[in-house]
């Protein structure tokens, strides 16, 4: 038995890969295992190559992804060709015998660059002709890979005969073959597997029953023939409940708990899933009792979305939008209007690869500096960045609290990696959740109201309809909101806005904004933000086992940066032992740290391919810097 198993399943977009993840993740999680799963896919509805990367851990916690995988399940020939070098010694490969004679040159959906690289790699390995059969033979011979060759056509024939399906209908159960094989090799408890199936197909009884039968038959055949070679140790005992959800899901959940009453959006990857889930909660009820409603509006564009959010926030509603890079680019003028007028709106920003359309379905951390300086002029904003699923849940709530308490826009930064990763997440601690509406007034004295008093950076905020008469304009204004270009007024009002940031810097606890992980006497410090936290925490454990005492400094709030605490931690380390780890080219967070503290980074581990930072390559990168004196390591693993 093993502590972890890493699974890789691939196939054409639209062939049921996501179903594999949706069934297996809750099945393993229900047994107490930690699960983390990532889906990589092209900007394409049907046909292009897509794959799911899953790690199941007996530790009970969702652990970071790494290669090589213990199992590769190939729905098509392209998966075998593409991922032939992603599996380790003695791993399992399941493939369709019907694809054995397929040639690499026949894969029309494969990008030319990848095909050329694979041809070169195959020639160097002595794999010719370039067929699935030859690749499989090589893996058996050179890497002792245990091959499970199944005739998908024969399996579908049985399915057609037994359940009266058409050939086209039977093809829809392609992912069930992979689920069955994985269930057999890991000896997955059938009740747990059934839980996963019911979660996915519970509303379609006939489809559920066919899947149960088909998956069980494949699982029995594979386990009988190959044994439960990937069986996991029993999960370590843990307390409390867990939920299986993506980053998009937990942010939506957090917003509901945090009291969102209005969200506007224009569809964009990878942000849309959050708003789509929120639409399911438009009418809030518990035990039949209505708790109110959420208005979710899909607007004609991002300008309309953010502008309507501003309007909703001025009425006193907790209001937000969710977007990605191109959408945020359209929102920046309205962001400036909100910053100038003390509007407490929230922008949930899921980063993807840019510039322009860039890599619309791939991840990135390249928009941090853009978030910090977006829109013309100078005005305060809070930038909060979540490192994992649980942080994303709490941060979705805290973003509203911070926006209303400090009366400024809050940008909640996430990335595609976290958005699309599905994880087993500890159920939130309700006692830790607090709602802070700041100085919001729902009833105020009637008549003209000093919304922007010169001597009060954080003044009472009467909402529209409260009775008070308030004015909001894009021009510089006086205390009542009327346009006023007087230089003395300009001086005072400008400072008034920035004093809010000074107050936020004093009042937001530093232990919330930054977290140090590791031994106090560590010799190497990794500094990162966002989803880098996921691989970094296990990386420092592995490095310690390899004789490198490393720690991780997680930057959760980038504006205002907790510069005093960050400076104190950095001062304990030799500059050559401090490594910035980021999924961008410039090392953007390190530049903010330098700007705020004066500390000059000399060492970098960076990645900008659009694929996640994997555990194994991060560990290798740190060792390369520590042992070989490298200044910069560029990571590139992933297909």
From Swiss-Prot:
Spans through the membrane: none
InterPro entries xref list: 2-oxoacid/accept_OxRdtase_asu, 2-oxoacid_Fdx_oxidoreductase, PFOR_II, Pyruvate:ferred/Flavod_OxRd, Pyrv/ketoisovalerate_OxRed_cat, Pyrv_Fd/Flavodoxin_OxRdtase_N, Pyrv_flavodox_OxRed_cen, THDP-binding
Enzyme Commission number(s) of this protein: 1.2.7.11
pH sensitivity of activity: Optimum pH is 8.
Top-level enzyme category: oxidoreductase
Thermal dependence, as annotated: Optimum temperature is 105 degrees Celsius.
Residues that hold substrate according to the record: 269, 352
GO terms classed as biological process: response to oxidative stress
A Pfam family the protein falls into: PFOR_II
Motif (YPITP motif): 266-270
Gene Ontology MF terms in the entry: 2-oxobutyrate synthase activity; pyruvate synthase activity
Reactions performed catalytically: a 2-oxocarboxylate + 2 oxidized [2Fe-2S]-[ferredoxin] + CoA = an acyl-CoA + 2 reduced [2Fe-2S]-[ferredoxin] + CO2 + H(+)
Superkingdom per UniProt: Archaea
UniProtKB keywords: Oxidoreductase, Pyruvate
Written domain comment of the UniProt record: The Tyr-Pro-Ile-Thr-Pro (YPITP) motif is important for the turnover of the reaction, presumably through its flexibility and mobility.
Subunit-level organization: Heterodimer composed of an alpha and a beta subunit.
Protein function: Catalyzes the coenzyme A-dependent oxidative decarboxylation of different 2-oxoacids such as pyruvate, 2-oxobutyrate and glyoxylate to form their CoA derivatives.
Name recorded for this polypeptide: 2-oxoacid:ferredoxin oxidoreductase 1, subunit alpha
Organism in which the protein naturally occurs: Aeropyrum pernix (strain ATCC 700893 / DSM 11879 / JCM 9820 / NBRC 100138 / K1)
Taxonomic lineage from the root: Archaea, Thermoproteota, Thermoprotei, Desulfurococcales, Desulfurococcaceae
